[in-house]
């Protein structure tokens, strides 16, 4: 079965794509990945907080109203609002300095969009890894490991995911810079937070919320709207972890 792997440098990081297909050949997979690459650069142009002419920068500068923004931007705005609601405000892209910053949602959201593009074009087995926010599709499960935030050479948990998304937030992923939107100071809830579920953007955002709340996330993870999501978190001050949800991972 033809398989193509590619690394795309964008958003100041690298996006890894692994796509296989029993329906189309490697040349066609390459063509589809080129379309995905164009989409990822469009995301950067519209949603970057670093590009002065992006729609997000214009929103932050009050030079654009959300109702006048491109559909992509409005979709992300709505997704961020939903994640804020689900997390009781522990994910809040409006609480950051300078105004609306969807960075904690966009990687997971875009990875899922890219995976859908690849599957729609005929790929059977797909992984899109946007710097730790991963979208997975396939007939066979993918094994995804979570790294120990205190020892990057150690895998502390493994999840099998066939069709879904996984996002991890921790000190190895700029965790020291995650602020608690309720207090404005550095988040001290958890050492690492992982979320698995059907929506990549929501996984990305709620992994950040886990870092903020730690075990206090118990107040919102039981929401019936999150019944398809799995949460796995390493406690900050104890050598222990806890989990909630349908995919409890593989014992290490």
What function would you assign to each model-found segment?
Residues 1-252:
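Mature catalytic core of soluble alpha/beta enzymes
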